[in-house]
Amino acid sequence: MKVLVLNCGSSSLKYQLIDMDTEEVMAKGTYERIGEQSFVTHKVNGEKFRFDHPVKTHKEAIDFMTELLLDPKYNTIKSLAEIDGIGHRVAQGADKFSSSVIIDEDVIAKIDECAALAPVHNKAAITGIRAAMEAMPGKPNVAVFDTVFHQTIPEERYTYPIPYKYYEKYGIRKYGFHGTSHKYVSARIAELLGRPVEELKTVVCHLGQGASLCAVKGGKSVDTTMGLTPLGGIPMCARSGDLDPSIVTYLMKKENLTPDEMELILNKESGILGLSGVSADFRDIEAEAAKGNKRAELAISAYAYKVAQYIAQYIVSLGGLDTIVFTAGIGENQYNARRRICENLKCFGVEIDEAKNHEFRDEGRISSPNSKVEVWVVPTNEELMIAR
């Protein structure tokens, strides 16, 4: 069985075609800057190809993707009939979805209803779903929700201390995100350790442009940093993460801001970008900090501290800690970020091997033999989990 997985952003499209009999990735790629100077990076047979191919819509991007999949020189597939189904990543399912579902018009309407809690993510997913249905009519489309993995979080941890009527009326509670990634990584670390997932207490640190931590006990999410929306939790590249709520109303009054303007500041102008004044790219900030830029150094320190603070908090949530696992763009590639985070956790016996951490590539242990907690780097594979 061959499954095509689509992950749509507001101006991007990530795709993978997976042979589920072997779980082999037959082809994958990323379409970037849809609507502008679009280009696609296509990977097949261990080779990478880049095409500058401007498109205005996700439908046009999917059409060109299918051309690449069918191109005889790559020998991927001969016909779209070989694709048995299409899986879509959907960020927010709120309390409307407790599992993956086959998509129909009713499902699309409910995904749209949830969009108020993840407007950029859910709207993009709907765009991709519509485009896929149009490009490949008759194929079953399945929605896989980031929020489903967090359905096991206990009530006292997902409930906010505001009047309960707002939960009853509007469903205001912690939902969590990156569930597909957290599920994959927590299962993968059990495989790597050769231990049953049911006995492990793990904190997964999904550190990318968007970032969240998840406390996983026995293979189930028991707490996570993101909340009602993907804005909560640790500071991110451009998102604020957790704040004193009064900051929002104080700034709105002082700056005469509308709710939409305030939301834009918190989502697009905050986090390490807001602190550093340099960039939303961790690599740029590290380069500036190395030159002596104090605000860049402040951004890195604040980021590392907050991640470590949540890991420490989750030791209580888990009743102990066996493993810390770093994943996603920053977690997998920024050794200095991992080092700074773990330095804050020395009081818990966390110790990394500096050489392994610095030289590390791909997947493996970076903690020292003396560390009381194992520290690993495991590349995430959300697409495989969606396909499964």
Show where each model-derived region lies.
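Glycine-rich beta-strand-to-loop/alpha-helix junction loops that act as flexible
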Residues: G9, H88-A91, L207, V325-N333
